[in-house]
Amino acid sequence: VATSNQLADAMSDSGGAAFRLGRPFPGRDDGPCEPHISLFMMAVDATEVAEVAAAVAGAARTVTPVAASAVEYRHNHEGAPEVFFARSDEFRAVQRAVIAAAEPLRRGRIRELDPGGNPLAAVLDDPNPKDPARVRQLRTYGFDDVSDDQDDRFNPHVTLTWPVDETSRVDLTPLCPAADFSGRLTDVALYGMAPNGTCTRRYGSWTLTGDPV
């Protein structure tokens, strides 16, 4: 949260920040923007949340905690500063367990927008996509950052804030070492999403309790 505030303050001269971790998304009152690593995103109705929660809880019982090693900061293509973690089989196992349990409940539905606010229908309708692997994963999972047998697109990261002016790039050199974010991922959670991929409305969290392989 401190790093999010540091970056958001630094964006004040270039349009400001869309959100700060630990605070509600501006204009919403459904909870603070929680620091998180996105494992999966899906579209469901409010009446189906309990079913999804039960699926995620079941997945958590099948996999072990993850040693999360933060390795670098960098901007995403929309200028949002993010801290990235080393890809690992432990991370992949957790993501695959969650998707195996929850994705069938998607029932083919596609989210309206990606975290940057871009319509996903346009990505799927493009006859000449720039990123065919992304399109394939969106059609298969409704999510395009998946580690599967064809493409390893899962790149664990935390989005620290998001610039209002997406052409700007805040300086990342004053930040604490990325390694300071390293730790142990012991729980998965289910959240409702706000703009820019933020997690605001909390539905539950579950400890990873599976036996080591």
Name what the model sees in each region.
Residues 1-69, 73-76, 88-187, 195-213:
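Basic, often amphipathic N-terminal segments
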Residues 82-87:
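Short histidine-centered catalytic/ligand-binding loop motif
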